[in-house]
Amino acid sequence: MSLPSASNHAHAASPVYSNSNNNKSSASSKKTSSKNDLLRCAVGLLLKQKNYVSNERFRRSDFLLLQNKQQFAVNKMLDTDLHGGNSFTFSNVQVITNNQHTVDQQFGRFSQFVEAQAEPLRLEMKRFYGPMLCHFYLDLLKAREPRGAVELLRKYAHLVAPVDMYDAPPPTKINGCSTTANESTFNIRFAKEAQDTGDTELDYFMRLVQTLSGYTRLEAAESDDTVAHFRSSKYELHTTAVVVNRICAYLQRRGHVLIMNLLYTWLHVHIVENEQRAFSEDHLLGLTDDLEGEDGEDDVVSKPAVTLNTRGDIRPSKSLTEKSNRKRPAEEPNIMLETDIKQEVETDESAELSKLQLNIDACLDTLKSATEQILKSQVELPRFLRISERSRGLTSAHLDPSECHMLAGFDNSAVQLWQLNQSYCRGKSFYRRYPQKRCPWELNNCANQEEETDEDSSDEDVKCSEEERRERNRARHCKYADNSYNEYGGFQLRGHTKGVTDVRFSAHYPLMYSVSKDATMRCWRAHNLHCAAIYRSHNYPIWCLDESPVGQYVVTGSKDLSARLWSLEKEHALIIYAGHTQDVECVAFHPNGNYIATGSADHSVRLWCATSGKLMRVFADCRQAVTQLAFSPDGKMLAAAGEETKVRIFDLAAGAQLAELKDHSASISSLSWSTHNRHLATACSDGTLRLWDIKKLSPMSDNSSAGSSSSATTNRVLTVNSSCQRLVDVFYGTSKTLYCIGT
């Protein structure tokens, strides 16, 4: 037996030798792989360990290691301009979470530092308010602190521009039952004077603050295009080196970390000596097409600049291109042709004419604005109407919507109607004020009626005494001087069995209403002056009434401690509003018709839902009986007055007292708001009238007594001592004329 040959079969079936051969082949294949693959794998493993990538598979396009010079320059520029997503920075959100008072404290101290500077520096530093306030607001929303964000914006919005406190729209639901405090929105509106400055940067941040005030959730705010653009990159701010040095020294001394991080993260401060950039709306919104040049000199030449003078006015400065164009080159000859001289003269004349036209237009605009301001500040004097009562006891009065007739109620159960002209009326024969006047309360004169009334009056003259007959004749032949109306003019309506407490013309129908101490309400028609309906539901005297702004409904207040809602089609009350502990002295409908306010002798004002009778608000700030109520035309405020010598104004949305109007000499007998929601007229029982400017109101502070007394003279526009012993009603007509009725 022969053994196998070593030379032929030495390593044929040996598994060891076969593995060694495979390893050698794999090693040769690994040597062929490039260095980029090795680096890519190493970088991928490092990024995976640091959790910088989310995918497990690495592609070649994910880790591109080779770039040309142009791509490297572009990426470098993007890295410097954009905020790096993987870079770790100090986060304001982590600090202000559950600690929103830190933002208020640091921003408040920064504002005190700015306001303490000199005038030029203060005007320049105030430009930091807008971006800082907006970014702090968004950071607080991101930290889930909406209440702190709302308080911060509401507290410091006036630093950006003057805020108009009462131009903000009301919340969607006045009762506030279905929305919580965190979900309720507020809106900031800046004053009209601040919107006419012509400063593009200021207008941009005013619009941004107004937009942010409507959002209390970060997701909703970031969905807005303006907010998203503002938050997408750093805001470029041009200022002087003095301002930057002052702010840096202050931050180093105080150590306000939140402000320093905000300036580092969201602001790009560019120092320009004695110059700053002229911001336009396109620059602020990033809509310009101009690109920065590669050379530094071209960049300086292409940028327009403006000069900041000591008063803070921004004036455009001459660019380097304009200066270079005005320089005469050395190669240009000094000899000019006659045609060139004529062309230069013509261009100079046209430039002067254009400047003159611009000056004329500016003067006309200034004159127009000044005229508008004068007319706006001018106050029209009121018109006084005096009723001679002769111990009849005048209790109430009112004017019709056409302002041509007057209605009065007396304590002797009489209701009397006059027309507002200087001629007297006898019986039902009303003299027409104008031939083509259309008024439902005005009747045509008839000869037969005049003869009948003459005969009736002659019979009455025979029955009356000589003194009464002399008084009648004097009243008939008199022209009612000084707008005085007595019992012999007009037409008397009889029906109540006790004294009349309140009367009212209907604003929607040719009707009028009257309530009396006999616990009834009567409705009178215009075409025949007869009683159309009698409404009975109260058990005690009725003191007041008011008609719904949408018609069909009337509300009354009574001595039975309740207010009741009536429909003109039913003789019994629909809803009873019970809750007061004493007489309901006054009632008022909200301008939208959905709410009713009641004032009582129990020193409280209550707000009710008109349809359900549910109690919405209780204002218990009054110290004496409330006898007068008046809603503002926009429905945001409620004025209450009575036996106190002050008027209290309540904010319906907040459910708290907003301000007080003092300086009254007696109890207030009537209130009335102007149609444009600017003035409030108050009439006193001693015959004095006061007009208040509501736009100048300031919110009540902790020491409200001192603040209210000091602001009383500034808010008061007009004080008039009428010839009446007492005023019973003030009324703004459709012609915006203020009528005052007294006796």
From Swiss-Prot:
Biological processes per GO annotation: positive regulation of transcription by RNA polymerase II
Disruption phenotype: Larval lethal in 2nd instar stage. RNAi-mediated knockdown in female germ line cells results in arrested oogenesis at stage 6-7.
Gene behind this protein: wda
Domain comment, as recorded: The C-terminus containing the 6 WD repeats is required for association with other components of the SAGA complex.
Transmembrane helix among keywords: no
Major localization class: nucleus
Localization: Nucleus; Chromosome
Subunit and partners: Component of the Spt-Ada-Gcn5 acetyltransferase (SAGA) complex consisting of wda/Taf5L, Saf6, Taf9, Taf10b, Taf12, Ada1, Spt3, Spt7, Spt20, Sf3b3, Sf3b5, Nipped-A/Tra1, a histone acetyltransferase (HAT) module made up of Gcn5, Ada2b (Isoform B), Ada3 and Sgf29, and a deubiquitinase (DUB) module made up of not/nonstop, Sgf11 and e(y)2 tethered to SAGA by Atxn7. Not essential for the assembly or integrity of the SAGA complex. Not a component of the Ada2a-containing ATAC complex.
Source organism: Drosophila melanogaster (Fruit fly)
Protein's UniProt name: Protein will decrease acetylation
Transmembrane regions: none
Residues in WD repeats: 389-428, 493-524, 535-576, 577-618, 619-660, 661-702
CC annotations in GO: nucleus; SAGA complex
